[in-house]
Curated annotation (Swiss-Prot):
S-adenosyl-L-methionine binds at residues 117, 137-142. PANTHER family: TRNA (GUANINE-N(1)-)-METHYLTRANSFERASE (PTHR46417:SF1). Specifically methylates guanosine-37 in various tRNAs. Its main location: cytoplasm. Its EC number is 2.1.1.228. GO terms for cellular component: cytosol. Signal peptide: none annotated. This is tRNA (guanine-N(1)-)-methyltransferase. CDD domains: TrmD-like.
């Protein structure tokens, strides 16, 4: 996958390109990350990249010309080799909230360009003419789009074949099937008097699978019940969830 970044602070993306799973993916050429700084497209000696908003008000906007030129340069670079255009995404609090389904959809793209805003945002006309989609990582405001962009890259990279040791790791993560992840355990067998669930050491794969599914359903129902509203549960999942609710009700009735 190729990802282009439009940012006033491209150095921040060393956290993605130089470290961890994504850094390894870059070294293996499974993920290519290329940055453009709008400051490099300015025409004045001060390299100005902000401008006043029409209508007044607090704050500044990103200057149109350097930002647009940077985006267009990234677009041209994206399709230079094979003619495949990149989807251009603006990280914005007004965008669609990023979730696992969205991550999986974005991961199907060969190329993405991520535009990181600063100040109070960017000119609406640039959104209309240069941006394909707006995405948000949550209902809160940050000082820029770099951290949301890194979050998106990290999440999407997990679905690039070869990035994870086992591709099933991405498929078994929290939200991969709409459910929260089950609990995980490693050595020692007993930690501060708390033992590993016996079923996980039984070697019985079907029992382990069923236990993990039950734990995922229980955790989702207790912590994020709204996630269950949009799921089409299997017969097995419905039976397990009903049993979980009955046991929970029984325990509460005794307390």
């Amino acid at each position: 996958m190729w990802i282009g970044i439009i940012s006033l602070f491209p150095e921040m993306f060393k956290a993605i390109t130089d470290f961890g799973v994504t850094g390894r993916a870059v070294k293996q050429n499974l993920l290519q990350v290329q940055c453009w700084n709008p400051r490099d497209f300015t025409h004045d000696k001060h390299k100005t990249v902000d401008d006043r908003p029409y209508g007044g008000g607090p704050g500044m906007l990103m200057m149109v010309q350097p930002l647009r030129d940077a985006i267009r340069e990234a677009k041209a670079t994206a399709c230079k080799e094979d003619g495949v255009e990149a989807k251009v995404i603006y990280l914005s609090p007004q965008g669609r909230k990023l979730d696992q389904a969205g991550v999986q959809t974005l991961a199907t793209n060969q190329k993405l360009i991520l535009v990181c805003g600063r100040y109070e945002g960017i000119d609406e006309r640039l959104i209309q003419t240069e941006i394909d989609e707006e995405w948000s990582i949550g209902d809160y405001v940050l000082t820029g789009g770099e951290l949301p962009a890194m979050t998106l890259i990290d999440a999407v990279a997990r679905f690039i074949p070869g990035v994870l040791g086992k591709q099933t790791s991405a498929l078994e993560d929290s939200f991969a099937e709409g459910l929260l992840d089950c609990p995980h355990y490693t050595r020692p067998e007993v930690l501060d008097g708390l033992p590993v669930p016996q079923v996980l050491m039984s070697g019985h794969h079907e029992q382990i699978r069923k236990w993990r599914l039950e734990q995922s359903l229980k955790r989702t129902w207790l912590r994020r019940p709204e996630l269950l509203d949009s799921l089409a549960l299997t017969d097995e999942q419905r039976v397990l969830l009903n049993n979980i609710k009955k046991r929970h009700k029984s325990v509460n009735s005794r307390t």
